[in-house]
Every structure is written in structure tokens, then in C-alpha cells.
Amino acid sequence: MKLFGTDGVRGRAGEKLNAMTAMRLAMAAGIYFRKNSITNKILVGKDTRKSGYMIETAIVAGLTAVGYNVIQIGPMPTPAIAFLTEDMRCDAGIMISASHNPFDDNGIKFFDSFGNKLSVEAEQAIENIFFHNEIIENNQKIGLEIGQSKRIDDVIGRYIVHIKNSFPKSLTLKGLRVVLDVANGAVYKVAPTVFSELGAETIVLNDEPNGGNINDGCGALHPENLAKEVKRLRADIGFAFDGDADRLVVVDENAKVVDGDALLGVLATYLDENKMLDKKEIVATVMSNAALDDYLAKHKIKLLRSNVGDKFVLEMMKENGINFGGEQSGHIIFSDFSKTGDGLVSALQVSACLLAKNKKASEIFGSIKAYPQKLSNLKIIEKRPLDELKGLKELEDELKKLGIRTLFRYSGTENVIRLLLEGKDEALVTKKIAEVEKFFIKALNE
């Protein structure tokens, strides 16, 4: 059994992710982090799901059982945990959240002492300890060696100051009418405070979490409700966050949802114009539209592509000394300000871009038009290595000659292959996706 997925441990609360699993996972993580412990403190935060109380209690029990002292800070965004772990000199940070998933799911994410997500090797080491009964039993403490926990409620101020410092001091949000959809999630207190203190006229939606309404018809996965309010209130811009606020979706003044690649492209050129781009390079994933490549090329900015997942975006950024990157889905990383995707930092940078250019959002983001794409999720019998499929290379070469970009990858959780074709000629792309489907049906189902 494998515990860790692409972003920590995640599952239905009370089933796959129950109290026993959470406690044992915390014990395993505590044992792992104790090897290089400096302060013997671990920070624990959560989003607004009801199951967070159960999981938080189990995690505290597991960590204190192996001798760790725990600092509980309550509902806070995931990027706040990354920042505060380093800022408060903790050995590690733990975030209890299932991000954009429904309320009955939950998850556990880990950060090292520098606020970075754990490497695959570190996750594997924790997983090995989790399944090793003898190691777990031998590392439980007794007497005064048992850890203790305390709750601190005022750390929100540290994070708010940090976020506000990412906004240019030469600008003010005064006169900007902003609508925020905080998704009944972890950012429900922080986001309105930040925008109001910077001078914006701030209207807030979905800021009454009750444990079961996080992401429920609201937030980054449902920007249509935000769009209606932006139009009704004649706002300048709207921002929607997901449950743990590491993702951002933007709505312009005409109630149109801004394409994620347009967001990346415009922000990259804004940073470059203001000498905030360390290199004339950014990182996106293989899912980003080729229109982004072409737009950046006109501005002499190179696009590097990573695998899907903000963890892989960040890895490539670090490897290449790049300070900006992100995903089409709205995970955007400004590494000068945050160690992970931070929806609030992104929202402030978008606002700064609007003010600096003195233009409407629709004018700025409408300059990048995505090329037509066709996506297909094909059910298959077996997942054979793609490089072993006879005729696939020839098919890809033929499509490339026709100006069509291809991306074929298996689902990580089900017997499905995801097919993507992209090109400037929509009719041709539509015709060719049918041919590609036939190829894979024959190759993987016969």
C-alpha cells in the first residue's frame, strides 16, 4: 500500500484517512524529523473542514508520543504553513487539507524546516517507518520525554505582514473595487484583511465556513458565481481561491474567467518589465498551451516545461535558478515571496500589474489567445509503456509536421489514458483526435 500521492496523503476522512492512520503517520514523520532536529517543534495548521479537528488531534497525539512539541495555529492557508514553519524556526510544518476536494475528503501535507515540500525520498522514508512496527514502538517516549502542545492564535498577523510586503510599496489599492471568493476555506480571514488594509474596496463572498461548505459551489472550482457578482457590482476584478488558498482563479471586469496561461504570460512580462524576473525564463507544465510559448517568445522570454504538479514546477525552477512559474490551473509560484503556490501573493501581483499598466483586466489578459485544444479521456484495459507502442512515434511525428502538439499520459488512479491535441487549425485538430483515439483503442484494448 502506498500512502503518499502527488501532494501528500489524501483520502476520505474517517475511511482511508482515519484517526489511527493520522496518528501513526504523525509518529512516523516525527521519528524521521527527529534525526535532524534543531528546535524540537513542529507547526500544525488546517483548513476549515470538520474532519480537521479529528485529524489535528490525532496528529498532535502522534507527534507528542515520539517526543515532539507541537504548535497548533488553527485555520490558515497552506502557503502560510510553509512560511511560518521557517519563520518560527520549527523542524517541520504539517498542513491538514484536501485543497480543492469536497469537504468529506481531507489530507496531510508536510514541509521541511525551510518551508519546502518534502522530496519523494523523504516521503518514502516516512512511509517506510509507518509500515515498520518495531521502529514505531521503539521510538515512543515516556515520562518527561513525552512532548506537549500549545495553541497560538495570533500568528495570522505575521503572515498578513509577510503577504503585504509582497505588494510594491509605491502602489496602493485605493480606488480598486475587488470581489473575493474565499471558498469558505482557510483564507476566509486573511484575504479580506490584506486587501482592506492595502486600501481596496473589498467585497467578500463565501466567508462563513461551517465545516461542511468548503469549496461547495464556490471558490476556484466554481468561478461562475464570482463572475456574476463582479458584473453585478461593477467591480474592477475578482479573485477566487480554493480551500487551502494555494490556487487562484481571476475574473476580469466583464465577468470573464481569465485563462491560466494568459495569467502566467502577462505576469511574466510584468515581472520582466519591472526587473523582477531573475532570468528571462519561466516554468510552466506540459499542459500549458503553445500560445504561451509564442507570446513569451515575442518578449524574448523562454518557457521551460515540467511534469504536471506544482512540486515539479518548483523543482525545475530551483534547478534552473528561475524565480517565477506555475500551472494552468492557477498554482502560481513567486519564489521571491513564497516557497509554494500562494493565491494571495498571486492576487496582489495581478492587482499591482493592473495598477502599473493603468489598464482594465480584460485589455491586459485578452492579449493572449489560446490555440484550439481537444482533450479525450479514453478507458483502456492495460497501461503499457508508451515507448513500446508500435507506430506511436510515427503518429506523433506526422502530427508534429501538421503543426499539432501532442500530450499522451496515463491517469495515476484509474485505467484511463489522457489524450491532448493542440494546434492553430481547430477543424484539423478535431479530425485528428478521432484518429488518435482509434490508434490507442487498438493498441491498448486488443
UniProtKB/Swiss-Prot annotation:
Domain of life, source organism: Bacteria
Free-text cofactor note: Binds 1 Mg(2+) ion per subunit.
Keywords: Isomerase, Magnesium, Metal-binding, Phosphoprotein
Residue list for modification Phosphoserine: S99
Catalytic-site annotation from UniProt: S99
GO molecular function: magnesium ion binding; phosphoglucosamine mutase activity; phosphomannomutase activity
Substrates-to-products reaction catalysed: alpha-D-glucosamine 1-phosphate = D-glucosamine 6-phosphate
EC number: 5.4.2.10
Cofactor needs: Mg(2+)
Name of the top EC class for this enzyme: isomerase
BP GO annotations: carbohydrate metabolic process; peptidoglycan biosynthetic process; UDP-N-acetylglucosamine biosynthetic process
Description of post-translational modifications: Activated by phosphorylation.
PANTHER family linked to this entry: PHOSPHOGLUCOMUTASE (ALPHA-D-GLUCOSE-1,6-BISPHOSPHATE-DEPENDENT) (PTHR42946:SF1), PHOSPHOHEXOSE MUTASE (PTHR42946)
Stated role: Catalyzes the conversion of glucosamine-6-phosphate to glucosamine-1-phosphate.
Record's protein name: Phosphoglucosamine mutase
